[in-house]
Amino acid sequence: TFATIWKQAEQKFDESGNESEVGINGFHAFRASWDEHPDRDEQWRDAEIGRIGEEKFRREYGCEFLVFDETLINSIKLAVMEGGSPILNMGQTRWYKKPSPEYTYCIALDPSMGTGGDYAAIQVIELPTYEQVAEWRHNTTAIPGQIRVLSDICKYVADTTSNPQGIYWSVENNGLGEAALIVINDYGEENIPGLFVSEPIRKGHVRKFRKGFNTTHSTKVTACSRLKTMIENDKMIVHSKPLISELKGYVATGSSYQAKVGMTDDLISATLLAIRMMGVLKDWDPRVYNTFTQAETDEDYEPPMPIFISGY
C-alpha cells in the first residue's frame, strides 16, 4: 500500500541509527503542503478543522499518518516532534549538545547480547534541563564493548566539563544485565568516571542486592507514565530522530507498552532507565527534585472543587 511505501521511505536510519539520503526501500520521500493549493487559506483550514476535527484534518490534508494504535505519546504530539542532526559523531555515539560544567548528566545503558539481534542502547540526559545530549545504539557490540562505550562517554563528559562529580550512570540488571555487572566488576567501577546509581532497597526485599536497576511490569509502567507526561508537556527535549521514530511505534500491549512487530524500542528502554535514575537523583540533588517534580506534573490537571457537607 501507499502508506507502507511512505513509511519505509521515511525510515532513513541504518542499524546504528545513522541517517541516509533515502528510505530503506530506496525511495526518497517529500511532502506537498495543503496551503500550496491556491484556493486554500487559513480561513478554509479553520472551517475544515471545525467540520472534521484536527486529527482527521492532519491525516487527510497534512500528509501525516497519525496512527490509530494507542501510542504511549499522543499521536498529534508525535506528528510535530522533529529531531535534529548530531553536532558530533564519536564512533557510533551521536552528540547533540556539548556537555557543560553547570549541569548534571544522567547516563543509562540498556545492554544486549550483541549478536545481531536486540540492540544495546545508551542515553545521555542533561539535568535539570532534561535535554537529550547524546545516544548510542548497536546490535553487534558484545557486552565488554558496551561497557567500554559507556566508559568512553563518561570520560568525554568528565573531560569536557572537568566535573566528574556531575556524572551519574547505571545499567539495567535484568537477564543480560547480570553479565554487564560482571564486566563492570572486571573492568573496575572506579575506572568509569561518575557515580554508579542503583535503585534503593525496598522494604521487604528478600533477594540479594544487585547494583543497577531491575525492571518489572510496575516500574516500567510508572516510568512510561513519567516519560509521557514530560514529553507531552514539553518538559523533556528530544533531539534524536531514531528515538522519535521508535516512539511512533511504541504502542499499548495489554497493560504495558512495547514496540510494534518489526520495530525496536531499545532507545526508549534506555530513556526509561534514565527516567528511573532521575527518581533516585531527586532525593540527592535539590535542583533535580524541584524540576523533576514539576516535570511530572500534568499542566492540564485541574484539582476538583471542594465538597462541603453540613449537618444543618
Model-inferred region functions:
Residues 30-32, 61, 135-136:
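Hydrophobic residues at beta-strand termini and immediately following loops
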Residues 1, 126-256, 304-312:
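Mg2+-dependent endonuclease catalytic cores in nucleic-acid-processing enzymes, primarily RNase H-like
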Residues 34-109:
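ATPase catalytic-site recognition across NTP-hydrolyzing enzymes
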Residues 28-32, 107, 193, 211:
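Hydrophobic/aromatic beta-strand patches that form the interior of the parallel beta-sheet core
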Residues 100-127:
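Gly/Thr-rich phosphate-binding beta-strand-loop-beta motif of the actin/hexokinase/Hsp70
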Residues 275-312:
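Acidic two-metal-ion nuclease catalytic site recognized across multiple nuclease folds
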Residues 266-278:
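Stable alpha-helical structural segments in soluble proteins, enriched in small hydrophobic residues
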